């Protein structure tokens, strides 16, 4: 009984300390200090723009069409995706690819003052390639690309929340 009590107190203490320093699980909680955002992008209707807009709305942030109506303006300056050979087999065939996705952004206040200067966020994944199973490996690459896009969006939202 004494051991259970000590474990309970220790768990409560660790939880209190973690919550007190602002730590939280990824994807939990909301962005409290942001109410409205405008997204400026050359490709307004590409997958990244749409996913960013959905994620902001899921965090109770209104995405407005006019930059003057927004509390913040996220400017997407550039977006790149690359797929490079990471390793080759003994028979000189691709056995692993490196996927990299980058997005260059700026965050501006409503008055146009830069809050986050031009910053490039990036993420990468590696995946094994099997030439005998090309379709499933392409599906895996597409899944990894969606995960990478979501990771970049989380990075943008965390910078917006900072």
Where are these regions (language model features)?
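Sec-dependent N-terminal signal peptides
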Residues: 7-13
């Amino acid at each position: 009984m004494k051991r259970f009590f000590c474990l309970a107190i220790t768990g409560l203490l660790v939880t209190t300390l973690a919550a007190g320093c602002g730590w939280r699980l990824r994807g939990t909680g909301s962005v409290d200090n942001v109410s409205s955002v405008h997204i400026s992008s050359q490709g307004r209707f590409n997958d990244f723009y749409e996913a960013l807009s959905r994620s902001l709305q899921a965090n109770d942030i209104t995405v407005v069409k006019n930059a003057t109506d927004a509390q913040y303006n996220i400017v997407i300056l550039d977006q790149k995706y690359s797929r490079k050979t990471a390793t080759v087999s003994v028979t000189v065939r691709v056995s692993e690819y490196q996927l990299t996705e980058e997005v260059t952004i700026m965050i501006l206040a409503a008055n146009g003052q830069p809050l986050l200067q031009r910053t490039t966020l990036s993420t990468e994944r590696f995946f094994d390639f099997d030439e005998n199973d090309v379709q499933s490996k392409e599906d895996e690459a597409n899944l990894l690309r969606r995960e990478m896009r979501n990771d970049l969006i989380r990075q943008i939202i965390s910078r917006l929340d900072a």
